[in-house]
């Protein structure tokens, strides 16, 4: 496939007029407009046969000046279209993956809720089975199959969190950090769990837990009432990720900077942030980018099962949720309960309503999550040898085409 006449988002984080060549599910060339003819000639010369040469040119897309960016990667969301990852159902995961691909999210790492340990183990085992089945299906995938986002990990938001900052999590299932249980989670998921959230102030053994687990899984600060000092200690011990910055954590003030201040001070910490226009004021989004380098910010959707669905009553982690417009809240007390916005819309909102440069926003939804997940060598940028997951956006950032695995 040749994708021509597009503004290619390069690995250096800028847009350059040119094109992309894919073969199979892999990007094989990226060219500027000036080097177009030379690149195409070279590709034809290196093709092994006339059949390959014909395949190279039989599918040419005229991008008509569209932006060409990598497929988005959402490493923290719960569900969409009436389904939730924690339903523990492979067909639900498949439907979620199909919806995500349709909106431009080509790789997913869904999040768990705070549920009983045995139930979480079952959910993780189901996810591991789904992943293995997908690997077999991909070998016989045809052009008529629906596109699916690749399942690249799991983000465990609980159960080692704070009851004070539980948000829309069920307090009855919160437990202190426990290495044996954490290992059970990793084993049940066949090590698909990439992030394990904790509230360090809730466990006397938090620092030792982090030190003993950090080489097996990314430890994140999640739903935590930690002070600046406690959060700083956890990050210095090896925690390297912060779950939805500003939300479900200590407030950020000039005398008590809390988790936000600790994350800002630690150059190794990556922070998730929800840019749906509901969870955080635009001014605080801009402030976060000024406090931390853009390379450490990760856009997430935190979407729940009502995403893509009409207003009404739904559930999240066993709790009743009311959805009105773009806001999801617990029926019990009005607490925000995830979002009803997909990652593509969050990225667009960050640019059009919050003043984040497009080049920065794209990195926060592609490159940065890929780095955090440890998959940047295979996806997250438009680079030779990487997965051919590419989105075409018009000048209004409206999605025009999803190219998944080169098709």
Language-model regions, residue ranges each:
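N-terminal metal-binding scaffold of metallo-dependent hydrolase/deaminase domains
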Residues: 1-39, 45, 49-50, 403
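Alpha-helical scaffold segments that flank or form the walls of functional sites
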Residues: 67, 75, 85-150, 172-189, ...
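Divalent metal-dependent hydrolysis catalytic cores, especially in the metallo-beta-lactamase
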Residues: 78, 94-126, 148-162, 189-203, ...
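Active-site loop-to-helix "anion-binding N-cap" substructures in soluble metabolic enzymes
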Residues: 79-88, 109-119, 248-265
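Active-site gating loops and adjacent loop-to-helix segments of metal-dependent hydrolytic enzymes
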Residues: 98-109, 163-190, 233-235, 239-245, ...
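Active-site core of metal-dependent hydrolases
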Residues: 187-309
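His/Asp/Glu-enriched, well-ordered alpha-helical/loop segment
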Residues: 261-271, 289-301, 307-393
